Amino acid sequence: MTFDPVFPSATNGMLFVATDVDPADEPDFNRWYDREHIEERVRIPGFLSGARYMSVQGGRKYLGLYRTQSLAAFGTVAYRAAFERQTAWSVTNLDRMRDPMRRVCAVEAVTGMGTGSQLVVLPLPASCAGAPLARARNAGAELQAVDGFVRSFLLVPDAALSTPLPRESTEGRALTPMFVVEASTRAAAQALRAGAAAAFDADPASAWLYELGWALEASALS
């Protein structure tokens, strides 16, 4: 499965939402996410695509990524209305999120094109706070030579837009940039995780591995 073959030259935005869910609630949570939530979000003007991932190793179990034309999509009347007019199903399942993590980010330092079935998410260590963009560009240039590399980019959270979810803890909440690598196989993702960690002087175990479940493009909606 592929979607969104390449980011345009303008800086895109991305909504990053990761969460755990109690096992007893997972069937209805997944049904809601697949049948209602993704489509609702992707229909918002300025949203380009939405995708669901599940953890292979590390991180919260579920991850949703929503790409937008720019960060401006998160300041529109339509986006605010999506929260003010929640369905009962949405209210129920948003309350089921456990240890959620919400970030609204600028997508920077893009290398490659296409969408991989595997995702590496590396929260950057504090030592990279000085020049994350340059290091992300250099890392992408090196990693694209690895077999199975699809694309890499840096997610830079916007402090004003990254408001926490109702059940998200604000204690020690750090808006850390995240380096993301997409790969075509699990083996490639493992190798790219090691390479990404080395590029940022990070522990490979601090990176999360996810697998794509499904994706929806705004262009596919009627």
Located regions from the model:
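Macromolecular interaction modules
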Residues: 1-222
